[in-house]
Each structure stands twice: as structure tokens, then as C-alpha cells.
């Protein structure tokens, strides 16, 4: 998702193609999103993986593109005047400055993916999402809550890990901007 966001920030044509796709994926009900994948790939793990990826990568694309486009024009102009190539400008100036927003996009992608796992249980995944679905279907409060709490714990751990990684990367870029 972040790679597509970087491409979209660098090329307006890519952004124009991705924007309606992202808008559609973001506003489409989760159950409806499963239909085209089931029609093409039938029910199974691969179908669920594709549906989760399609739903979850939208924030990474949006946040990456927005973060890179939000880099102050003065900073870009100064780097260009100092002789930065387009590649150097992207990797040494824009990405380090957009990193907090890009990491927020990664965090949201992980959270969206975890939330989609319960819905993906409808197309044949196994795991905690399926246990939540089974608990719902059977009226087994204990199984559903245990699996739901497990998913919440995984989400909290993932959130803390991406936040710590973001801080670490920010420290790296601010302490040694030439790296």
C-alpha cells in the first residue's frame, strides 16, 4: 500500500487512477467487498487473504500519498536547489518528513486487516475471526468473547509495535539525516 501511495504522490496520473478505486473500497460495505473475490476465486483462504488486503491497504495508500504531498514546498525547493536528484529528494527528504503519517497509515492498515478477519471468516478462513463467527452463530458467548479479546490484544500489541517503530525511525532520521 505504501508503495502505491509513493507512486501516487509522485505521479498525478497514478493518483487519478487510485483515488476512485480507494474511494470505492473505503465506502463499500465489507460483506459486499467479498462478493467479487468469491465469484472469481471461490471460497477459501486465498479469497479471504485478497479481500483483507484489498480492504486494508486503502489507509496505507491514502496516508502515504497525503504525507508525501504535505512536505512543505520550501523544503522540496531547498533540497532541489542543493542538487538533490528526484530519487534523493524522495528518499532523503520527503519520506523522512512524511514518515509519521506513513506509519499512521501502516498502523491503520494493520487495524483494518485485523477487523476484516471476522468478516473473512465467511469465506473460509480459520483462526480467531472464525472463532468469533462460530461464537456468534452458535450463541456461544464465551468462544466469541475469548476470540474477540484475543483479536483486541493482537491489535493493541500491533499498535504499540508500530508506534515504537515509528519513534525509532524518526529518531534515526532526525539524529542522522544523511543516512
Question: What is each of the regions a protein language model found here?
Answer:
Residues 9-12, 41-43, 123-124:
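Short helix-capping/hinge motifs at transmembrane helix termini and TM-loop junctions
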Residues 60-105:
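Short cytoplasmic-facing helical segments at TM-TM junctions of multi-pass membrane proteins
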Residues 28, 40-41, 53-57, 64-68, ...:
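Hydrophobic/aromatic residues within the transmembrane alpha-helices of Major Facilitator Superfamily
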Residues 1-22:
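Transmembrane-helix boundary motif in ABC transporter permease subunits
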Residues 39, 68, 113-154, 170-177:
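Glycine-rich helix-loop "coupling/hinge" segments at transmembrane-helix boundaries
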Residues 22-56:
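Generic hydrophobic transmembrane alpha-helix motif, especially the helices
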Residues 2-7, 34-36, 40, 60-63, ...:
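Alpha-helical transmembrane segments of multipass membrane proteins
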Residues 54, 87-120, 142, 146-158, ...:
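Transmembrane alpha-helices
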Amino acid at each position: 500500500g505504501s508503495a502505491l501511495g509513493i507512486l501516487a504522490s509522485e505521479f498525478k496520473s497514478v493518483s487519478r487512477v487510485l483515488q476512485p478505486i480507494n474511494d470505492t473500497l473505503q465506502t463499500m460495505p465489507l460483506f459486499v467487498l467479498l462478493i467479487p473475490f468469491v465469484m472469481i476465486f471461490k471460497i477459501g483462504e486465498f479469497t479471504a487473504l485478497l479481500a483483507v488486503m484489498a480492504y486494508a491497504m486503502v489507509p496505507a495508500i491514502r496516508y502515504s500519498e497525503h504525507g508525501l504531498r504535505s512536505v512543505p514546498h520550501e523544503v522540496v525547493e531547498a533540497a532541489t536547489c542543493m542538487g538533490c536528484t528526484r530519487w534523493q529528494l524522495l528518499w532523503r527528504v520527503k519520506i523522512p518528513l512524511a514518515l509519521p503519517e506513513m506509519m499512521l497509515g501502516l498502523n491503520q492498515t494493520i487495524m483494518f486487516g485485523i477487523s476484516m478477519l471476522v468478516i473473512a471468516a465467511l469465506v473460509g478462513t480459520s483462526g480467531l475471526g472464525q472463532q468469533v463467527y462460530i461464537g456468534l452463530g452458535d450463541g456461544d458467548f464465551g468462544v466469541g468473547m475469548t476470540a474477540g479479546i484475543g483479536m483486541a490484544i493482537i491489535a493493541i500489541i500491533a499498535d504499540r509495535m508500530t508506534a515504537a517503530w515509528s519513534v525509532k525511525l524518526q529518531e534515526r532520521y532526525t539524529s542522522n539525516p544523511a543516512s
